[in-house]
A protein has these predicted regions:
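PLP-dependent class I/II
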Residues: 1-130
Length: 130
């Protein structure tokens, strides 16, 4: 495996693209920050409307980490139901350590239409209406 790390590297074109991005970060990054901020607040506002969900106002990044506490269900059971009935895949917070138990992680890396579509499906689940 050492041989692979010495002989192989990131393709040259990717290295050039990365260098270009770093060199132009003052132009590229602000619109991206604004877009992710809008997506994050969209997800936050949609999560606040769901029963059995507690969410703190986001302060950065493109992840949001709400607490899910549906009576009579574990987080894994809730996530399984969401996936099976809505085809929306969310990550169990416990995957990031024991402190994540009862939480889920949502990445807002898709466009706002997709975020709204996912929440439209989730809001229709009975577990979030009871």
């Amino acid at each position: 495996y050492i041989h692979e790390n010495i002989v192989y590297s990131v393709p040259t074109i990717c290295q050039h693209a990365g260098a270009l991005g770093i060199a132009n970060r003052k132009t590229i990054c602000p619109p991206l920050y604004e877009e992710y901020k809008e997506r994050m607040y969209l997800a936050y506002e949609r999560l606040k409307k769901l029963k059995h969900v507690e969410v703190l106002k986001p302060q950065g990044t493109f992840y949001i980490f709400p607490k899910i506490s549906v009576p009579g269900m574990t987080t894994k059971e809730v996530l399984k139901e969401i996936l099976e009935k809505t085809h929306v895949n969310l990550i169990d917070g416990e995957a990031f350590g024991p402190a994540g138990k009862g939480f889920i992680r949502i990445a807002v890396t898709v466009n706002k239409d997709k975020i709204n579509e996912a929440f439209d499906r989730i809001e229709n689940l009975e577990i979030f209406k009871k």
